[in-house]
């Protein structure tokens, strides 16, 4: 039925051009969005495989459809590798995304209207941690904690006071824009004081956790969620982990299926299995060490150029640049740096006076640039280029000069050679 003539190129010119243009953009731009990375050709191969054809409601060995014996192998591989990677007793690889993983955990542990606590979005949290525009803030009563306005660090004493006041049923420890180590033991202590479940969302730092460069929450949290992309460098998807607890495990399984989802995406699960196998290799730890070194180098260079970093530094792959004292908005900075072929994202900073559509900060991350092969030398050059642009976001001649340098560096370090 299908032969090699069935290609997008020969069928859909508009879509083919969009894909080709995106491939060129990835090669000709330096990616500094903290939540993005480049997957390996092996991951791409799995995700584009015939496993996309197979419907497989249920779990390995307990499917509602026949013909699942081979996709069962893929899912069992993903599960066993994730258990080994994170030291977890239970793993569910079926969530389509990190947000759906978080939603499944909440469905398993909470009832509509229950109170839970999460980090405020402007302070570095995530939409699913209680934002009023998200399901988490609509279906449940969310109480937000934040960072100290002077230090930029989580104020655990204030968090504890809020917990004692509101008696949440669940506390979420996690972030999308926080550059420091979370004190899992303190979170556990606070949760125990009020009889709350503790959920850790490690979507941003999962790769660092997997190799021991960031403390693991698995021994402390009742449930851990993550995405499988970002620092983990796998396909876009979600993952749920926990230590041994038969009651919670059963709740999580039924919450994911049939509670949240129908058929799992078996081609994505196969891609997760490949990514987890890659993450178990010694070179993955070397990569994560470089991610961390690059983030610290970027932080140091930008500080030397007069830019404020929220919390004063970084312990992971990201940093949050506070532009309030520079008199420019995150939106302006994002656009200007983008014109130099450096991709970043505007981001709110703690106590930001501007709206989330404008913001007063930039979030920068090093996972993708490190995958590309950048080390301290390249990151130093790159960080200075970012500062050059930010020094005058309206100087198009300077932006053009930086863009030329970016293109030369991109050719030296292709993504897919």
Curated annotation (Swiss-Prot):
Q: Where is this site: Plays an important role in substrate specificity?
A: 229
Cite the binding residues for (6S)-5,6,7,8-tetrahydrofolate.
Answer: 121, 125-127, 355-357
What Pfam families does this protein's entry cite?
SHMT
What are its GO cellular component terms?
cytosol
Annotated coiled-coil positions are none
The UniProt entry lists the main location of this chain as cytoplasm
Q: Does the keyword Transferase apply?
A: yes
Question: Which GO BP terms, alphabetically?
Answer: glycine biosynthetic process from serine; tetrahydrofolate interconversion
This protein's cofactor list reads: pyridoxal 5'-phosphate
Q: What does this protein do?
A: Catalyzes the reversible interconversion of serine and glycine with tetrahydrofolate (THF) serving as the one-carbon carrier. This reaction serves as the major source of one-carbon groups required for the biosynthesis of purines, thymidylate, methionine, and other important biomolecules. Also exhibits THF-independent aldolase activity toward beta-hydroxyamino acids, producing glycine and aldehydes, via a retro-aldol mechanism.
Q: What is this protein called?
A: Serine hydroxymethyltransferase
Q: Which organism is it from?
A: Legionella pneumophila subsp. pneumophila (strain Philadelphia 1 / ATCC 33152 / DSM 7513)
């Amino acid at each position: 039925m299908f032969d090699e003539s069935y290609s997008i190129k020969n069928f859909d010119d508009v879509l083919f051009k969009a894909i080709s243009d995106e491939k060129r953009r990835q090669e000709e731009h330096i990616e500094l969005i903290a939540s993005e990375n480049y997957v390996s050709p092996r991951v791409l191969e799995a995700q584009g495989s015939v496993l996309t054809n197979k419907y497989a409601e249920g779990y390995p060995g307990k499917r509602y459809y026949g013909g699942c014996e081979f996709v069962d192998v893929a899912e069992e591989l993903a599960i066993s590798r994730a258990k080994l990677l994170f030291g977890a007793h239970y793993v569910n690889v079926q969530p389509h995304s990190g947000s759906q993983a978080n939603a499944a955990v909440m469905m398993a542990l909470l009832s509509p209207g229950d109170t839970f606590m999460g980090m405020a979005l402007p302070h570095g949290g995530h939409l699913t941690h209680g934002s009023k525009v998200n399901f988490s803030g609509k279906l449940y009563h969310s109480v937000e904690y934040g960072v100290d306005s002077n230090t930029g660090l989580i104020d655990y004493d204030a968090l504890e006071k809020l917990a004692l006041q509101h008696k949440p049923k669940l506390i979420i420890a996690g972030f999308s824009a926080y550059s420091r180590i979370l004190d899992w033991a303190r979170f556990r202590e606070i949760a125990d004081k009020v009889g709350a479940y503790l959920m850790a969302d490690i979507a941003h730092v999962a790769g660092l956790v997997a190799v021991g460069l960031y403390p693991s929450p698995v021994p402390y949290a009742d449930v851990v969620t993550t995405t499988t992309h970002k620092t983990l460098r796998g396909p876009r998807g979600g993952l749920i982990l926990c230590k041994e607890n038969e009651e919670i495990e059963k709740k999580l399984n039924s919450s994911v299926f049939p509670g949240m989802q129908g058929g799992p995406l078996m081609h994505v699960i196969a891609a997760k299995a490949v990514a987890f196998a890659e993450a178990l290799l010694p070179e993955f730890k070397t990569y994560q060490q470089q991610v961390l070194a690059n983030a610290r180098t970027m932080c140091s260079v930008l500080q030397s150029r007069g830019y404020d970093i929220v919390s004063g530094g970084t312990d992971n792959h990201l940093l949050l640049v506070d532009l309030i004292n520079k008199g420019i908005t995150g939106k302006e900075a994002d656009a200007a740096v983008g014109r130099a072929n450096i991709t970043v994202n505007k981001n709110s900073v703690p106590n930001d006076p501007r709206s989330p559509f404008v913001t007063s900060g930039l979030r920068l991350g090093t996972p993708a640039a490190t995958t590309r092969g950048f080390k301290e030398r390249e990151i130093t050059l790159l960080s200075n280029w970012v500062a050059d642009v930010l020094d005058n976001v309206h100087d198009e001649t300077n932006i053009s000069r930086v863009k030329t340098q970016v293109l030369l560096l991109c050719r030296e370090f292709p993504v897919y050679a």
